[in-house]
Each structure stands twice: as structure tokens, then as C-alpha cells.
């Protein structure tokens, strides 16, 4: 559970995030750093190298879509399970995504935020975001239990 101060820090910081850029980089990095996650995206075309993944327009578009959903979830920090219920159902029952991938993506997102915002992404802001991405990963994994 986040305090009111932590919620304000996360939502305030998120307003600075370009979801197109950060989403593309986060999903691309996930697919490069954890190549076994590529099996869910084989229909995206060329994922044969880091350069191919990072430049792939389908990866970029889906990364934006992922962060659009994350952005929507930030509006419901007190009910992440409710906010992500439909996506949890989809990823569990239809797509059969390993729920560990949600945790991996959350951690990659934190890395990308740190890379893009440098000193502005302070240890305290990181701590707040780590709580949020853990909560989102838990919410997305909810239908698996």
C-alpha cells in the first residue's frame, strides 16, 4: 500500500514520461535481456538481434500500448487488482504468459526510467516506483492463483 505522499510522487513523476519512447524501450529491453519472452511476440517479425528488436515498429507500438495500460492503472492505485482484472484474465487464460514476466517488465521499466531521467529519478522516486511495479505485477498475476 502506498502512502498519499508516495502516490503523489509517482503520479507527478509519471506526468513527465513519454509513454511512446519509454514503452518502446522497456518492451524492447525486456525482449533483449530476457530473450525467452520473445516467444509471445513471434508474430512481430524480426527479433533476431538487439538492433532488430529495438527498431521493430510492432515492439514500439506494443510498448506504448503496455504503458498506456500502466498509465490507466496509475489512476487506480488503491485498486490495482480491479484495474488490471481484464488484462490479468487475458494474459492468463488466452495468452498463457508466465506471470514472472510481469515482474521482469516492471523492473525493466524502472531501469528505463532511471536511464531516461538520470538524477531526477532519485532513490526515493525509485522506491515508490518499485512498489507500484510490484503491485501491478501482482495484480496482473492475480488470475493465475
Swiss-Prot record:
The modification S-nitrosocysteine is found at residue 92. The keyword Transport applies. Residues 1-145 form the Globin domain. Keywords: Acetylation, Heme, Iron, Metal-binding, Oxygen transport, Phosphoprotein, S-nitrosylation, Transport. It comes from the Eukaryota. InterPro entries: Globin (IPR000971), Globin-like_sf (IPR009050), Globin/Proto (IPR012292), Hemoglobin_b (IPR002337), Hemoglobin_oxygen_transport (IPR050056). Heme b binds at residues 62, 91. One of its GO terms (cellular component) is haptoglobin-hemoglobin complex. Gene3D superfamilies: Globins. The modification Phosphothreonine is found at residue 11. Involved in oxygen transport from the lung to the various peripheral tissues. This is Hemoglobin subunit beta-3.
